[in-house]
Curated annotation (Swiss-Prot):
Location, primary (coarse class): nucleus
InterPro entries in the record: Amide_Lactam_Regulators (IPR052073), Transcription_factor_dom_fun (IPR007219), Zn2-C6_fun-type_DNA-bd_sf (IPR036864), Zn2Cys6_DnaBD (IPR001138)
Source lineage: Eukaryota, Fungi, Dikarya, Ascomycota, Pezizomycotina
Gene Ontology terms for molecular function: DNA binding; DNA-binding transcription factor activity, RNA polymerase II-specific; zinc ion binding
Name used for this protein in its record: Acetamidase regulatory protein
Sequence ranges of Low complexity compositional bias: 114-123, 671-686
Keywords noted in UniProt: DNA-binding, Metal-binding, Nucleus, Transcription, Transcription regulation, Zinc
Subcellular location: Nucleus
Region (Disordered), start-end ranges: 1-23, 78-99, 114-148, 627-690
């Protein structure tokens, strides 16, 4: 053993002399856990890896840090000298050369001569742009690759780090001391798991029963990255555009598939500037680079799309950070567009949609977009644009807040912006989805108030109960007021209606699912929570399946991944039902959701981490096998054997009846009856004393000018008919995409599966949710 340790501690040098390495080196596992390692003494594997049964023990090697050069002394870029044997291209006409130069100069302070690259650099930039958008990436010369590609060792290290980031969901509690919080040391990222509404907090607290008051956990080491582009080339790179044909394609794709539902840019004005090619009035280069990024997201295949988006994002971010664009309205627009970029999965705090929504909110409130511009001196076109941008910002802020369980960047109590009207969309093109934007703004505004009243840190328990009752009533009323073309339908689902109902049903699950051990909300559940959550999860998986079959998943925004994550957690619980019919039905929905998540991973990097979470779950694989066969043992404990036998008998009868005759849909007169608040016993619910500000229902926060009139609702009854929360165009169409027979009898079982420690612990058995 000592000889082995001696061999491992010695390393040959270039002159044949062995040199003893430092004894402080540790293996990769001990280095990640920040514990002492004795690999240099006892050899490999070390004592810690032997005790934990790890077989891949190896010495951790530090990454070599590249020498950081001064800005005044950049790394010289070697370019291939022109060869006499190669064909020399003919000189382009003067109009062809001057047009892109003037077009890319989006600000008056830089003259076309200053914006144009030097003579020695121009051929390289032009060839890079042409090569980038060709289908073949192998035509680049070795010299050009040497100019733009990092060393092979750095590329391999970056690939390994990227693979570790993708598996970070299964590494948080891999250590023996993973049952408790690990010290957050210097150089290690702190992970905020969000409040009780987030899926991260849900899974973590279901696994860690002693960490109710812990919201920050230790993550991975902070990565070190080097600047790959020379400082003297950043301006030239940021002002560079691809070939005109590709620019036309991406701009058209953006205004066809994205801007109609998120009218951030006034299409008529922008396209007029874009087509005229007027050097004195060009479109903002920052806005154009951001539009190219979003257009690339919805058009090109993955390999080419990732490369193009990285380049467009680098250019747009450099222009944004260096304040090349002086119009703050354009900065808000660009920040909202940059939320479509899927940055590296190692950071969703200072990158990705959460970061850019916060940046847009800061600039917008600094400009005063949250106040109603009543001054007559305000240009009508700018007033319309401000109102659109403000409500789109509210939408994205609410969706990203639900995704991560983080506070909203916008407090609507500080805003008095008037509701959106059809006139606010003037100049946004013929394809603009006016009704969708208006109703989606109403939904997100309502969700914002519900979250604050229901999940606020300083909200009393009485107010929480009242907020849940008001939330269900307001959501049902909003659903009933939807126009026919926005209502939920079984087929031909367009991306706008899909995003509307995905956000709606995602919030239904977050509002009604039991919290782990139900700490602060133990008495806030209702008699139909199981049906509401199961129906909402079924709607979500059906919408994703419809979009996947029609190749429309690419049109969904960032939050679509987390919406599917919420539904898969609900379906994951249903896989453990003792009723085999419900379990097998859940298995089909889980398979469909997994396929949709795998497809979303092609567009959003954080979908890959969630996919790995479910694919690497050991207990999940066991439940998937059990779901394919009849379960002879019900969920009840051994002391409830009479009830278990009765449940088995009822289960067999239900199975035979379902095999003989199809399941009948609910009768039309049962679709939309009146309802009461979803509480365990509405007759005994105490009357809560609320402040004058709190006695308003959530309907009062929806702009009344945009709501269609509906018949008054009946008087409250004892229980809520939860089917009013799900609206369809066809009144004869079944409300649910699946049979709900047998689920009401399993309400307690459903709640216990959510509360118990085992069902979700396998998702974190090899690790946990890690963002940061």
């Amino acid at each position: 053993m000592s000889s082995t340790a001696q061999k491992n501690s010695l390393s040959p040098t270039g002159n044949g002399v062995t040199k003893r390495k430092s004894g402080s080196a540790a293996c990769v596992h001990c280095h990640r856990r920040k514990v002492r390692c004795d690999a240099r003494i006892v050899g490999l594997p070390c004592s810690n890896c032997r005790s934990s049964g790890k077989t891949d023990c190896r010495i951790h090697e530090k990454k070599k840090r590249l020498a950081v050069r001064s800005i005044l002394n950049p790394v010289p870029i070697r370019c291939r000298p022109p060869s006499t044997s190669e064909h020399v291209p003919e000189a382009s006409p003067p109009s062809t050369i001057s047009e892109p130069t003037a077009f890319t100069t989006a600000f008056r302070g830089v003259q076309p001569e200053a914006a144009a690259p030097p003579a020695s650099v121009a051929p390289n930039v032009q060839s890079k742009a042409q090569h980038l958008h060709s289908n073949s990436y192998s035509q680049t010369s070795p010299q050009a690759q040497e100019c733009h590609l990092p060393p092979a060792s750095d590329r391999f290290a970056e690939q390994d780090a990227h693979a570790d980031f993708e598996k970070r969901l299964v590494k948080l509690i891999d250590d023996e001391e993973g049952s408790g919080p690990r010290e957050i040391q210097r150089g290690v990222r702190a992970i905020y798991v969000g409040h009780e509404l987030s899926n991260m907090s849900f899974l973590i607290r279901q696994q860690r029963d002693k960490d109710d008051d812990v919201y920050h956990f230790a993550g991975s080491e902070i990565p070190r990255r080097q600047l790959k582009t020379g400082h003297d080339q950043l301006l030239v790179d940021a002002l560079t555009l691809p070939e005109p044909a590709l620019v036309d394609e991406l701009v058209q794709a953006y205004f066809t598939h994205v801007n109609p539902g998120y009218p951030i840019v006034e299409e008529d004005q922008f396209m007029s500037q874009y087509r005229n090619r007027d050097p004195s009035d060009p479109p903002p280069i920052l806005l154009l680079q951001a539009i190219l990024l979003v257009g690339c997201h919805v058009t090109h295949p993955k390999e080419e799309r990732d490369a193009l988006k990285a380049i467009f994002f680098r250019r747009a971010k450099w222009l944004f950070d260096n304040r090349i664009e002086r119009n703050r309205d354009t900065l808000v627009q660009a920040a909202l567009l940059l939320t479509w970029h899927s940055d590296s999965p190692d950071d969703d705090v200072s990158a990705n949609a959460h970061y850019w929504v916060g940046v847009a909110a800061r600039i917008a409130t600094g400009l005063g977009m949250h106040r109603n511009p009543v001054s007559s001196r305000f240009a009508p076109r700018d007033r319309r644009m401000w109102r659109r941008l403000w409500y789109i910002l509210v939408q994205l802020d609410v969706m990203v807040s639900l995704s991560y369980g983080r506070p909203q960047a916008i407090n609507l109590e500080d805003s008095d912006v008037s509701p959106l009207t059809a006139s606010d969309f003037e100049g946004c093109g013929a394809r603009v989805q006016t009704d969708y934007v208006i109703h989606f703004s109403e939904l997100c505004t309502m969700i914002s108030y519900i979250v604050r009243e229901r999940f606020g840190l300083r909200v009393s328990s009485e107010r929480r109960k009242a907020a849940l009752q008001e939330a269900d009533e307001a959501l049902a009323n909003w659903s009933l007021r939807l126009p026919d073309h926005l209502r939920l339908r079984a087929s031909d689902m367009d991306p706008w209606s899909a995003m509307l109902h995905l956000t709606y049903n995602n919030f239904l699950i977050l509002l009604h699912r039991p919290h782990p051990r139900a700490s602060a909300y133990s008495d806030d559940y209702g008699p139909h929570d199981a049906e509401i959550c199961s129906a909402a999860a079924g709607v979500i998986t059906s919408i994703f399946e419809e979009l996947r079959l029609n190749d429309r998943l690419k049109y969904l925004w960032y939050s679509g991944v987390h919406t599917l994550f919420t539904a898969m957690i609900q379906v994951r619980v249903e896989l453990r039902f003792s009723n085999p019919v419900l379990a097998i039905n859940a298995l089909r929905r889980f398979d469909s959701a997994s396929c949709s998540l795998r497809e979303l991973a092609k567009y959003w990097s954080h979908a890959t981490t969630i996919l790995r979470l479910f694919e690497d779950s050991k207990r999940l694989q066991k439940d998937l096998r059990l779901a394919t066969s009849e379960r002879s043992r019900p969920f009840s404990s051994t002391q409830d054997q009479p009830q278990a036998q009765a449940l088995d008998q009822n289960k067999n009868q239900h199975q035979h009846s379902s095999a003989d005759a199809p399941v009948q849909p609910p009768q039309p007169d049962r679709l939309l009856p009146s309802y009461d608040s979803p509480t365990p016993d509405s007759t005994s619910l105490p009357q809560t004393a609320v402040s004058p500000h709190q006695n308003l229902t959530f309907d009062s926060w929806i702009p009344s000018t945009n709501l269609a009139t509906v018949d008054p609702m009946d008087q409250p009854r004892e229980f809520l008919d939860w089917r009013q929360l799900f609206s369809f165009t066809d009144p004869d169409q079944p409300v649910l995409p699946m049979s709900m027979d047998g689920l009401p009898e399993l309400e307690d079982e459903w709640r216990q599966i959510y509360w118990q420690e085992t069902p979700m612990s396998d998702l974190l058995q090899d690790g946990g949710w890690m963002h940061g």
